[in-house]
């Protein structure tokens, strides 16, 4: 396959994916750079194990506390008495910083919510959003956390399908430069990448467990979505490598949704999804094949023009969930009794991202969450982080790491996909899983949530399960909170998804 042809493919995907920047905030130039890098190495490249080997030999500096901070006292200072505008709750919540490199002044922000009941025995779960450079507070306040934000941008309401009904949930803003996380050393922000992020997350976790020692030895899980398809397995492998020292972490499994797993299959999988859902016409696909997908492609301009047409056809929809509307008017509105009655977790709010930004940039909110006064506003995603991310890391396959994790009998690996996402659609994930040569131990069957089909699932040897969620987009807990909680509950309990209503 020639470079000109590859370039046209990446141009097309660039235009398709740029519309998705409304959530991930990745700039057009950044996406182009990433995809151009992929085209240069070729789409037919075999799955390599470079990243697995890098994780195996990842050097993590000593996470020992050298600042003289009393961790118990710091934990007490991290306690959040109440978030502004929150309803009353029965669980404790904490927010604060853990320094992962004292000489550089590099600190990561966390928000932690205890389980609603039996918190002393339930496991600890670390949640990571993707990007790279997107805040996990989005997951906390828009997806699986205990609160959602009303349209006034200052009042919270309860999420009855919060994952802290099942476990203690720790949200981490990483890598440095994401959300409220910061560094005093400018060079920390210049060359971000997977290895640095994995090392910082591991150091954070070890030091956080010193602050919250009651969770040492507790069952521990890592979950996340999107580019956390890199973060989660890399951190899991890092933990296993370093568990031989005194900082043992009782890792029992990983859960990743709509994940970036293998760069090679993203092109074919994306086209497959768009055509199968009538979002890309057969004529456009045929024209693409005739103009661009040949050994002697036509003039470059033909491919660019076709890419522009495809982009124009789909750019007005929500590419993160093709069944939901886009945000048209993001103006904050006063809260009334009527608006309270009309707002529920089960009703998708297309402008929810704007409500989060308004809430987290309030001075009283940041004060209650123990946020250091930063010279910039909180943003859902840091464009510079995504733009500067190591291109080799972007293109690395996570499949070898997943297969390595499957060798550990005590670990379970679950992957799930919302089936109305076009950014990382189920066809991309299914192509990637096919490359793993998994051995199925069950049929492809429907699973149920509260009497209705929640999606389809299949289990494989090696404690590996794949599940789809019907009607859910890129952020499954946002669009289908009931089904997401059912899936999470069975993952934590290590039980099969319900196969009967």
Swiss-Prot record:
GO MF annotation terms: serine-type carboxypeptidase activity
GO cellular component: extracellular region
Tissues of expression: Expressed in seedlings, roots, leaves, flowers and siliques.
Highest rank taxon of the organism: Eukaryota
Cellular localisation: Secreted
Keyword Metal-binding tagged: no
Protein name: Serine carboxypeptidase-like 39
Taxonomic lineage of the native organism: Eukaryota, Viridiplantae, Streptophyta, Embryophyta, Tracheophyta
């Amino acid at each position: 396959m020639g470079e000109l042809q590859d370039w046209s493919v990446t141009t097309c995907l660039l235009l398709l994916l740029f519309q998705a920047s409304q959530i991930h905030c990745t700039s057009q130039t950044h996406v182009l750079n990433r995809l151009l890098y992929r085209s240069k190495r070729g789409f037919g490249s075999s799955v390599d194990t470079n990243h697995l080997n890098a994780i195996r030999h990842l050097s993590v500096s000593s996470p020992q506390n050298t600042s003289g901070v009393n961790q118990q006292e710091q934990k007490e200072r991290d306690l959040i008495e109440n978030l502004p505008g929150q309803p009353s709750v029965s669980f404790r919540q904490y927010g604060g910083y853990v320094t992962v490199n004292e000489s550089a002044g590099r600190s990561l922000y966390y928000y932690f919510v205890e389980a609603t009941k039996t918190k002393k025995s339930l496991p600890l779960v670390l949640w990571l959003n993707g990007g790279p450079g997107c805040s996990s507070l989005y997951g906390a306040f828009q997806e699986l956390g205990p609160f959602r934000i009303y349209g006034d941008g200052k009042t919270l309401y309860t999420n009855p399908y919060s994952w802290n009904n099942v476990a203690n949930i720790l949200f981490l803003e990483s890598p440095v430069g994401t959300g409220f996380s910061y560094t005093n050393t400018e060079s920390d922000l210049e060359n971000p990448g997977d290895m640095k992020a994995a090392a910082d997350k591991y150091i954070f976790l070890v030091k956080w467990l010193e602050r919250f020692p009651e969770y040492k030895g507790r069952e521990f899980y890592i979950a996340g979505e999107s580019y956390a398809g890199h973060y989660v397995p890399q951190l899991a492998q890092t933990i296993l490598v370093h568990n031989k020292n005194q900082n043992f972490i009782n890792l029992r499994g990983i859960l990743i949704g709509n994940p970036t797993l293998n760069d090679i299959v993203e092109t074919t999988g994306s086209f497959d999804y768009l055509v199968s859902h009538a979002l890309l016409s057969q004529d456009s696909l045929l024209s693409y094949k005739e103009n661009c997908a040949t050994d002697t492609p036509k003039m470059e301009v033909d491919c660019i023009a076709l890419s522009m047409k495809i982009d124009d056809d789909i750019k007005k929809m929500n590419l993160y969930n093709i069944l939901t509307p886009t945000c048209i008017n993001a103006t904050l509105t006063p809260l009334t009794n009527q608006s309270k009655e009309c707002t529920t977790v089960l009703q998708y709010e297309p402008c929810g991202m704007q409500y989060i930004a308004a809430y987290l940039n309030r001075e009283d909110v940041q004060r209650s969450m123990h946020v250091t006064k930063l010279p910039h506003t909180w943003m859902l995603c840091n464009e510079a982080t995504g733009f500067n991310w190591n291109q080799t890391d972007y293109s690395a396959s996570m499949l070898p790491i997943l297969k390595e994790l499957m060798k550990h009998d005590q670990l379970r690996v679950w992957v799930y996909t919302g089936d109305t996402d076009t950014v990382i659609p189920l066809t991309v994930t299914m192509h990637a899983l096919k490359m793993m040569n998994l051995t199925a131990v069950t049929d492809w069957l429907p699973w149920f949530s509260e009497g209705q089909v929640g999606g389809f699932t299949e289990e494989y040897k090696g404690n590996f399960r794949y599940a789809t969620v019907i009607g859910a987009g890129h952020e499954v807990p946002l669009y289908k909170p009931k089904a997401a909680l059912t899936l999470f509950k069975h993952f934590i309990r290590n039980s099969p998804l319900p196969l009967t209503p």
